[in-house]
Structure formats: structure tokens, C-alpha cells
């Protein structure tokens, strides 16, 4: 897409410009970093009150305690607002804004929680039909009361209908635009992005075309005056936004080439680009870094192909579905492939969420569902664990065939039942290359799902139901079952640009790092090529 107003250098008073490579466009929901649970109506409604308001009110009550906790590395990732005491007034204003702007969502969330408590108390195995009359008004018509086959009461939501209701609130969607100061950011789950003199506020919902305009502006120059007009920049913010822009020629986006070979590139964490011999490509769990000064080598957005045939998502956690990167890629993506969901409160639809933020072509695949395109095959495989034993079905490991090479992207799959991988070997054959995580010391499940629970979980039980992936022993069984000849440990959250959403301790003496090292060594002892990935990698087969 060439610039519409002539070549670089024309019009010195109105030059052609692009975004600087360190400019962050961070999507926000009522000032909180936007992750999928803050877009989907049910989870957004419950998080507004039971996560956001709860932690903000705690900060206002004891700001010094929060400041002290945030200075302790062992407490990173905890419910502590990483703001100075001087921000108490601004936080009080955010509390009032949240209560006003998200009032209908909070009302729905309270009604949903009340409905759950009601059926837990009153549904005793007899017909559940009389309980519909007791449902609070905000949820009537949006929920179905059921029993599980084991006789336990449950509640399901009509999620498509909720996107047409007040529980879905586009008006609280916006973005903060600023220049990155290295890779460090406050922990996104507990600290809102407050306004500041170096931040430009973009008051547009995520489905707005302005996000595509900004994404293109990273690669295709436009007149400076057009950029200021497109962003509706007032005279008092012109200098700030101008600092986001550069006249330096941008990196050129290149198409995937027909090389006759398979190439894969690791972009950090669980993000891997696969290019098939005929040039068909897919991008797994896109989380792409900005230009950084941390010393960690990295690929950036301009290293991706000009067109991305398939974006494939493994599961609905913030470090695998990063809306910030997805919006930066939206204009380049043909199709997004996601695991089909189950429709429970803890399992919002990835397809509906992505469609609501402007993605037109989203395909859901059930287990063993397959897409074939040229020399690339993508198949959904079962993904056990890592969700605190909740009935979450929006998760898949992905089997990929690129030319004659087979791969499995297992992400955070926990090998709870090794027989599964024996069965998968029969279903898909030997897997040449295994990508598997070793995050075997995850947080208690309430860390992510606590705001969704109708009643608080017992702490001892919570500690046993962790968001764990496989450890070395379990991972080694996967390797043996699938007959893999290459093994790559990934999805460890160790890259510095992941810390603001994972809060994972990147040191080498942790249980995940130890298990990753043990798996690599065990594989190498068996003559299997093995490596723990970090930062970037580029492999042609």
C-alpha cells in the first residue's frame, strides 16, 4: 500500500511520516489494559466490580501499603495498585467514573452472581423451572438454568444476545498512545493506565478503523497533517503526537516466499510464525515486542509477512490472546482460527469477542477439526488442564503439517492423562517437532477466575487448583508418546516484554526453569534435539 500523496521528501512543511518503532498503542477498557475478559460481556461485567473496583478501593483505603507491596518483587502479580500515593485523588475519580460508566454492566454482574447463588441454594434435583420467576430482572432472557448430568445446578448464558445488551459496553473502550520506556510496565491486572502528559488518549472503540489506520502508519507513510486530522489532535497535543512520528523510511513489509522449505520463527513466549514451502503462513498466539533497549534480541511487527493467512489462538488467557498485538495486525490478517467454546460463564466465546473488535473472518474448530490451505494443515487437538479444573472448552493444542514436516504447539497443556497422547499418535501420526510449555508452578485459579465465582473459594482448595502446565516428567511422556525428534520448550513468559501480563519470575532457580532445563537435558540424552526458546529464533527445515 504506497502513500497516497507522493514520495518521501515532498512537502517539507507537511512531510510524509510513520509511527516510530517504540510507539505503544495500548487498548484500554475504562483505563484498564484490555484483555479478552474485559471485552466479553459476562466476564467484563464481573471484573468491573469484583476485580477493578475492589483493588481500587483497597488502594484508596491504604495507599502506602500498596506502594510498599509493589516494591517487593515476591508480591509482583498480586492485587496491589502500582501507583504513588499522590494518585489517590485520581483513583477516587476513576472509581466514580467506573460506577457511572459501567453501571449497567455492574448491575448485570451482580444479578448474575445472585442468580448463581439462588440456584446453588434452591435447585435440589427437582424441576428447575419455578426458579426462572426468581431471576433478577437484568439477567432475565439471557440465561438458562440447568443441571449437569451429575445433578448439580448450573447456569449458562446466551452470549450472542448479550452483545446486543447493556452488558456489552463499547463506550468504555479506548487506547493510550505513548512511547515505550523499555519493556517494563506495571502489572496490567492490578494497575490501571492513568492519564499523563506523555500519553495521547484515543477515544475510539476497538472496532474503529482508526486502529487499522494507525497499524498501517507503522509501515506506510502518510502526510503529517492527515495523521493529526485522523486522530483528531487538538492544538494542545500537536507537539506530543508529532513526537510519535518520524520521517525516517520504515522497514519494508515482505510477503511470505515460496522457498520449497518450511521455516518457523519464534517471536517470544508462545508466538511462532510458520511459513509452509508454498508460502502459506500461520501465526500462533501473537504477542509481538516493540523495539527495545533491554539487550534481549527480538523480532518486531515489521518482521512478520505483509499478509498473514492464519492467526491461530490456543486459549483465552491474556498472554496468548493479546488484543494490543491483534489490533496492530488486524489489517494484515485474513483469518483467525480459535477453539470452539462451551458457553459457560468462565468460558466466553473467542469468536464473538474477536468479531466484536473488528475481525471479520473468525473460524471456530472443535477437537480434531481441520483446515487445509496449500501445503499447510491446521488441526485442533485436545488441551487438558491449566484452567483450575473449570469447564473451559475454548482451548486447543494445534497440530500443524507444513509440507512434509509435522509440529504440535501444545502451549500450556498439562499432561494429566498420558493415554491421551497415545491416542493422538494414532490420530495424527508421529509429530516431528513438539513445542511445549513448562509453566508448572502457575497461580491459583482465582488469580484469573476469582471475579467470576459466585462464592469465594476455600484458600486451601484454591492453592491446589493452579493454572499449571506440564512439568518435566509429564512433558517427557508427551515426547515419547508422539515420537518427536525435536523438542522446544516455549511459552515460559520469561521475555521482558511479557512481564506486564504474566508477572512470572524469570530467574533460573524457579520450578518452571528447572523443569525446562531437565526436559531439555533428558531429550538430549536420548538423542533428541532440544532447546529452550528465548527472545527469538529462526529455523529453516
Could you say what each language-model-derived stretch is?
Residues 291, 317-321, 343-346, 367-372, ...:
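Active-site environment of divalent metal-dependent phosphoester hydrolases
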Residues 456-471, 477-478, 482, 492-540:
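Short acidic, glycine/proline-enriched helix-loop-strand junctions
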Residues 6-212, 243-259, 267, 273-316, ...:
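Pre-active-site segment of Zn-dependent metallo-hydrolases
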Residues 234-259, 341-405, 517-540:
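Metallo-beta-lactamase
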Residues 283-286, 307-321, 336-341, 408-413, ...:
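Active-site neighborhood of phospho(di)ester-bond hydrolases with catalytic His/Asp-centered motifs
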Residues 299-366:
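Active-site HxH/HxHxD metal-binding segment of metal-dependent hydrolases
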Residues 324, 384-481:
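Active-site-proximal loop/helix segments of hydrolase catalytic cores
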Residues 263-266, 281-286, 377-384, 406-412:
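Active-site-proximal beta-strand elements of phosphoester/diester hydrolases
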Amino acid at each position: 500500500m504506497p502513500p497516497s500523496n507522493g514520495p518521501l521528501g515532498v512537502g517539507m512543511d507537511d512531510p510524509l511520516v510513520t509511527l516510530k518503532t517504540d510507539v505503544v498503542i495500548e487498548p484500554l477498557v475504562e483505563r484498564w489494559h484490555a484483555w479478552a475478559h474485559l471485552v466479553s460481556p459476562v466476564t467484563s461485567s464481573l471484573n468491573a466490580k469484583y476485580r477493578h473496583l475492589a483493588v481500587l478501593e483497597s488502594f484508596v483505603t491504604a495507599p502506602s501499603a500498596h506502594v510498599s507491596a509493589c516494591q517487593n518483587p515476591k508480591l509482583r502479580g498480586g492485587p496491589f495498585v502500582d501507583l504513588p500515593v499522590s494518585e489517590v485523588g485520581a483513583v477516587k475519580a476513576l472509581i466514580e467514573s467506573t460506577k457511572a460508566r459501567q453501571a449497567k454492566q455492574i448491575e448485570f454482574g451482580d444479578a448474575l452472581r445472585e442468580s448463581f447463588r439462588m440456584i446453588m441454594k434452591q435447585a435440589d434435583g427437582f424441576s428447575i423451572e419455578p426458579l426462572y420467576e426468581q431471576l433478577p430482572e437484568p439477567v432475565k432472557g439471557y440465561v438458562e438454568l440447568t443441571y449437569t448430568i451429575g445433578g448439580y445446578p448450573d447456569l449458562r448464558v446466551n452470549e450472542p444476545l448479550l452483545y446486543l445488551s447493556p452488558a456489552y459496553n463499547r463506550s468504555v473502550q479506548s487506547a493510550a498512545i505513548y512511547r515505550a520506556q523499555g519493556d517494563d510496565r506495571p502489572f496490567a491486572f492490578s494497575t490501571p493506565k492513568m492519564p499523563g502528559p506523555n500519553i495521547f488518549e484515543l477515544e475510539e472503540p476497538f472496532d474503529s478503523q482508526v486502529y487499522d489506520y494507525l497499524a498501517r502508519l507503522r509501515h506506510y507513510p502518510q502526510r503529517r497533517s492527515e495523521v493529526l486530522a485522523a486522530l483528531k489532535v487538538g492544538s494542545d497535543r500537536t507537539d506530543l503526537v508529532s513526537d510519535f512520528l518520524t520521517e525516517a523510511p520504515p522497514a519494508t513489509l515482505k510477503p511470505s516466499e515460496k522457498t520449497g522449505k518450511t521455516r518457523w520463527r519464534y517471536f517470544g513466549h508462545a508466538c511462532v510464525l510458520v511459513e509452509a514451502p508454498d508460502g502459506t503462513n500461520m501465526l500462533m498466539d501473537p504477542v509481538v515486542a516493540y523495539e527495545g533497549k533491554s539487550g534481549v534480541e527480538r523480532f518486531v511487527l515489521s518482521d512478520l509477512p505483509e499478509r498473514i493467512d492464519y492467526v491461530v489462538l490456543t486459549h483465552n488467557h491474556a498472554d496468548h490472546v493479546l488484543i494490543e498485538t491483534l489490533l496492530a495486525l488486524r489489517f494484515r490478517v485474513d483469518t483467525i482460527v480459535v477453539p470452539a467454546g462451551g458457553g459457560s460463564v468462565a468460558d466466553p466465546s473467542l469468536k464473538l469477542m474477536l468479531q466484536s473488535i473488528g475481525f471479520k473472518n473468525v473460524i471456530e474448530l472443535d477437537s480434531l477439526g481441520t483446515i487445509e490451505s496449500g501445503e499447510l494443515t491446521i488441526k485442533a487437538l485436545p488441551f487438558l488442564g491449566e484452567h483450575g479444573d473449570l469447564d473451559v472448552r475454548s482451548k486447543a493444542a494445534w497440530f500443524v503439517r507444513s509440507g512434509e514436516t509435522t509440529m504440535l504447539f501444545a502451549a500450556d497443556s498439562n499432561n494429566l492423562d498420558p493415554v491421551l497422547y497415545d491416542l493422538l499418535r494414532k490420530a495424527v501420526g508421529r509429530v516431528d517437532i513438539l513445542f511445549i510449555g513448562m509453566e508448572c508452578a502457575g497461580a491459583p485459579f482465582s488469580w484469573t477466575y476469582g471475579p467470576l465465582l459466585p462464592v469465594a473459594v476455600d484458600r486451601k482448595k484454591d492453592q491446589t487448583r493452579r493454572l499449571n502446565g506440564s512439568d518435566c516428567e509429564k512433558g517427557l511422556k508427551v515426547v515419547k508418546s508422539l515420537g518427536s525428534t525435536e523438542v522446544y520448550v516455549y511459552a515460559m513468559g520469561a521475555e521482558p516484554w511479557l512481564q506486564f501480563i504474566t508477572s512470572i519470575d524469570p530467574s533460573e532457580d524457579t520450578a518452571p526453569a528447572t523443569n525446562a532445563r531437565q526436559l531439555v537435558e533428558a531429550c538430549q540424552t536420548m538423542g533428541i534435539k532440544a532447546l529452550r526458546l528465548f527472545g527469538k529464533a529462526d529455523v529453516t527445515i
